[in-house]
Amino acid sequence: MQMDDKKHTASPARTSGVPIMDAEAIRRALRRITHEIIEQNADLKSVVLAGIPLRGVEITRRLAEFIRDVAKIEIETGTIDVAMHRDDVGTRAELPMVHASKLPLPLEHRTVIIVDDVLFTGRTARAAMDAISSFGRPARIQLAALVDRGHRELPIRADYVGKNLPTATREQIQVRLQNVDQEPDAVWLFKE
């Protein structure tokens, strides 16, 4: 959940980054998250995976595919836009990119798993919870992140994490996914 952290600005030069995860490590992390989701949710038919654009949507697609392969269940997915639910909308220099939210309704009596690429301050996750509440009141909300880099500003914790990666606040984590970025799957650490 890197939006708090210059996610949508120009990328630093690739030469200054350190690769943290390659495509195979990302695949293994997502497979592990898949098994944890299956173990923690007895009724997978009541689960909705809700990806935060952009990379959270692609990660959601991959998780749903893995769940289908492992549990033989077609899990419902959706997209949850957080742009207008963020607590920093009025203080940002640029307007946030707005994407359409699309969730399978109703959400009542269901478990919604918010999916994002990076969990940082927790503000994007909080905004996602606010956005979900505008669609209904799920029985439970869980959080999945490919990378948890720490530095929470809110009392939010991921239920499912691919990789815990302690960082300095001035460092930046970038997740690159082939279907989104037209670059090989990788997680990069950039020092400023």
Name what the model sees in each region:
Residues 1-192:
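PRPP-associated nucleotide enzymes
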